[in-house]
From Swiss-Prot:
InterPro entries: Beta_defensin_dom
Gene encoding the protein: DEFB110
Span of the signal peptide: 1-19
Protein's name in the database: Beta-defensin 110
S-S pairs: 35-63, 42-56, 46-64
Record key words, sorted: Antibiotic, Antimicrobial, Defensin, Disulfide bond, Secreted, Signal
Family to which the UniProt record says this protein belongs: Belongs to the beta-defensin family.
Function: Has antibacterial activity.
Taxonomic source organism: Pan troglodytes
Pfam family for this entry, one: Defensin_beta_2
Location relative to the cell: Secreted
GO cellular component, one term: extracellular space
Annotated GO biological process: cell chemotaxis; defense response to bacterium; innate immune response
GO molecular function, one term: CCR6 chemokine receptor binding
Keyword hit for Disulfide bond: yes
Amino acid sequence: MKIQLFFFILLFWVTILPAKMKYPEYGSLDLRRECRMGNGRCKNQCHENEIRIAYCIRPGTHCCLQQ
C-alpha cells in the first residue's frame, strides 16, 4: 500500500504539477467571477427578460444577463 501511495505521489509530481506551472490559464477558471465581470448574476433560473450565457460553478446554476 505504501508503494502505491509513493507511485501516486510521484505520478502527480511528474505530470500534473509541471502542467499547472506551464499552463496556469487552464488550471482553475472562476466562472462566478467571470459572470460578475460581465454584469451577470449566477442564478438557478433566469427570468424571461434575462439571457442565459453559461454555467457558473455547478451545471445547475446559470449566468444570467439583463437584456
